Amino acid sequence: MTNSKFNIFINKKTISINDRAFNYGDGLFETILVKNNKIIYLKEHVRRLHKGCDIIRINKPTLSLIKKNAEIAIGNRKNCILKIILSRGSCDFGYQYPKDLIPNLYFIRTSISSDKGNMTERVDVAYANYKPLGNNNLSKIKHLNRLDQCLIANELQNIKNGYNDLVITQNKNIIETLSSNLFFAREIKKQYFFDTPLISDFGIKGVMREKIIQSLRKKGYKVNIKNIEVSDVKKYASCFKVNSVKGIIFIDRIGKNKFSKPEILYNILKSFIY
């Protein structure tokens, strides 16, 4: 389906060999939870997509266009995951492209996986050996160049001792896990304080991360966005990872550092625990 500004593909199983997303990773994506037939945080995901469009200079699809086609892709599926991929378009091979190239906009519905953590399941996390290089121009947005994450996923697949995830570090600072942002919590005089790693020249500023920061601050909790070194982890009592598909997952251990899962944290954050 084509309108004047975008080629639109809904639940398409194939892609053109000339699509620049396939050839060069020239595009953006968002992965969104659909719960009880509601698209969760659609406006926030589109806002980040638009920011990415500004950075890599692709035309912005409007919120109304995305919402309309997202609902078609979801159909009558009550709970699922919606992936939106925005490619610069299809053209002959070569880095340069025609100025009038029409972007390709894909809407893909997939099933929700069952590997969700909760308060009772054990989640052990190790540190990734792979150290990504920074790119301040492309960090924070969901661009299609995911080779760093693929290499870290390969490392996780081959690691022993039953680890569930890997923490990515850069210059001794903790950034995030393979596909989630991190929060650390300290209890001082029965009051909780929260820290989350600064996202600078690597990593994603997640939609769920921002929602949790806003929620905690609205409830009166102090949340610091700061550099957290590996050596700082032992200072914290609790830790959890977050993303927009799985919500909050509490972590039992990172490396040798063990964490607790107090009931009060569950009560504070329960609206984000899926």
Q: What role is predicted for each listed range?
A:
Residues A73-K78:
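Phosphate/pyrophosphate-binding loops at sites that engage ATP/ADP/AMP, CoA/4′-phosphopantetheine
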Residues M1-S64, K68-E71, S87, D92, ...:
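Helix-start/capping segments and mature chain N-termini
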Residues I81-L86:
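ATP-grasp fold ATP-binding core
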